[in-house]
Amino acid sequence: MSKFPIESKYNLAYKIASLVSDSLDVEHGEKVQHKYFWIWRADFEDELKASILEKFSELKTPKKETFLHDYIYNFYFAYFDYQEFWFLDDYYNWKIEDIIIFFEEKYISRLKVYDALNNSDINFINSIYQIFRESNNENLHDELKDVLNLYFHFLGNKLEDEKLMYLIGDEVFSLLFINKNFLFNYSKKMANIILELKKENQIDKLVQRPSYLPIWLKNAIFYRDRGTCQNCFKDLSNSISLLDLNELHYDHIIPLEKGGTNDPTNFQLLCKTCNKNKGIKLKKPKRNFVLYWERDNLKNNLKI
């Protein structure tokens, strides 16, 4: 019997998305941050603040490569570094087959899903497993130390492959981009840091309103929000003629006056009336996700 829970090899993007989301949780966020980032001997808040300061100019205009992508990549690497650290701290108490299962469940099955292993890689992995099986269970620490370091180096190179990293990053981003509570918490976290930087005179002024929004961003926000006002849920999908365009408002979730940015993650669709009423107030989303449809028997009974 394996000492590890069976994990779906398809759940890596969900796992990373969950870690990123949990890192901003009011009650448990600091615990998640510490759990994964103390290995790097880095203070999460200090690192985040330094990153925002370094890339502040990029938050002034919408870019397809968002700040959230960098945030995701940090958790992507921190997650695997965490697995490696605790494995190396305890593996000599394990059975050989459990060691092999660990690598298969945590690394190999996931790399296979993304077609990140070629025939040469598979042969190398099998040769490593053969060394494991031929080792002395009574003296694992001494016998396998160099082999494990070589194996983790191999896995690290695979995980750092840009094509794989960007693919997983896009999957995680897609999961988080539809989560309104996360977007509010994430944008508010950034806004608080930006206000702090302004107070410390590390930046001259807050982000200003852009002269225009690129069509790719408008399309993304419109289709993500199902052409629906995110406050009153008015259907705006028919408001696409020149006469009706003023009814569509691409609102900053966290107002610029309160430290908000022009990062794509800080926009939502509102109708003209709701946008006017919201003004520069902070307003949490009424729904975490946009419904595809409402079931009649549950309508008005559930808060999503």
Which positions does each model-derived feature cover?
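Short, Lys/Arg-enriched, disordered terminal segments
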Residues: 1-4, 289-304
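Short, charged surface segments at domain edges that flank catalytic/cofactor-binding sites
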Residues: 188-235, 294-297, 302
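Histidine-centered nuclease catalytic patch
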Residues: 234-269
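Short Cys/His-centered divalent metal-binding micro-motifs
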Residues: 237, 267-290, 294
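Short Fe-S-cluster ligation motifs
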Residues: 260-273, 277, 298-304
